[in-house]
């Protein structure tokens, strides 16, 4: 701790960021690391034994192909085979018509690249077209580097082997021999979330960050998609399991902010918490065995009063609704998503995106051809790899690619100087490479925001030390050339994406916030009563809110990187947006508390008041796009009937009013926190 105190604050924040990113714990990560690590060592062994070139490309196939579960790995393997056919076909098309004409090669490769980049952004299978784009723009440089067409054709045919045998290898390892099934990961994830929920129910613990809660909720939704595709039993009882996922997400996210010490520890409340924890444990055991949980618990009047006193009635009701649900309930038919985005042919940003990528590649090609420096051909690959839809995400990818390349180059330099002279055989080489590949696999399986560092580090290391050599190598020029190529490609891409049709998310962010608040207003319009349809709708929209808040948070981080914006305007936009996100989360949890109280009343007394909140929130959201939103001021009229039956409801809704009043005023020249008390609200 004393060492951290002596470091500058930015360094401490950077270390904390990497600690959070790299220490991510999720089901399936350890098997994925092992599969990736073993696969890399097998690729080195096979490539060195049979003298197969392009080792770095084979390693890249593994890092992109081995996924967190067997079904996803199999799906990506199929995409890789399709992409390989399209890649080789496009290369032979270029060679056939323009082998000896560099200008004609570019004229043919350019439209192929543009079409692939356009489809990468607009089509569901964008990964296939991304791979084709990389090979098309890179493969057309082979004739310029080699004077013999036969050699070029041989290298192109080797590319088929280099791409397909790692695909076969990852299918054997990740799908057939040591599969990590999505259904097993789902059972583990649900049990982990319920463990956390029980801990917060019984002990006074600090709440976990909301971003972590939202990411865990999104992870459960992704696993649900894989389970539907991979497991027949899950599909048969999908309605129950989807309801289970929604219920567990709600319990986990709600109890995260629960503090048992905030309520009087009467004997009735203590016994009720123990009973609730016991029911959650029963759900855990059923999930661990892959069984649909059925409960015979019927809440008594005393238990209902205890649940209401400690704000647990809604959690109790959602849990019981799951326990009494028929496992054979037919699922709701899911709408099939379109293969292309709706505005694929009407939004000019997609074609501009393709043109910008092509322009960056042409500038890099002209530069390295003009200076006759073929070793920096990685600059063209960099232009394609860092091409993201907007300026902020492109900058993020540039930083990750540069950071991974820097780490890989340093490792390659140390390896060449200190280790390579002492190696005599393939066994020693594998022992030395094992920790490097393990480190790369560990980083590559971390959070999506930083995982690319691991992939780039291993690929850069392999390019500098293992590419097309089948024995000791002491040439440091390769290390220099690969690093310089990545730097040049990053600089060119940064200039192009910043000044040529920059796609800023500064205007999109308020619209995204408006959509999120619109979802929150829909939650407020759902009748606050224990009716099965209302509860299920409430839970599903609530999961959507987790995804929406997380998307807004990530968009804020990307907008912070858009240096082409005015610094003061950017800072003001980010501060206001983060305040809206923070208050929106608080409003959602405060509205949960009103459900616990409103359920005791006749619902006919409540719609007007709930509609008042929803209308105010929708009005505020409508003004975000034009920066005309003011902090809502809501007047609550005390209803004698509700005050007589349950006086705590009015206090809870007054708290919601206070949270509304703290929403930022977007018409002010600078963000000033709302200190005035909402009309009708009490402290």
Language model segments and positions:
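Alpha-helical transmembrane segments of multi-pass membrane proteins
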Residues: 61-62, 354-366, 376-387, 402-414, ...
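C-terminal functional regions that serve as terminal interaction/effector modules
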Residues: 418-419, 423-427, 434-438, 446-474, ...
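Pore- and pathway-forming membrane helices of multi-pass small-molecule/ion transporters and channels
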Residues: 9-18, 33-74, 84-89, 106-173, ...
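Long, hydrophobic alpha-helical segments that serve as membrane-spanning/inserting helices
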Residues: 1-34, 41, 49, 70, ...
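Juxtamembrane or sensor-core-proximal signal-transducing alpha helices
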Residues: 170-182, 495-506
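A cross-kingdom feature marking solvent-exposed beta-strand/loop segments within repeated
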Residues: 42, 74-78, 96-101, 147-150, ...
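Membrane-entry segments of alpha-helical transmembrane domains in multi-pass membrane proteins
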Residues: 26-31, 46-52, 74-82, 97-104, ...
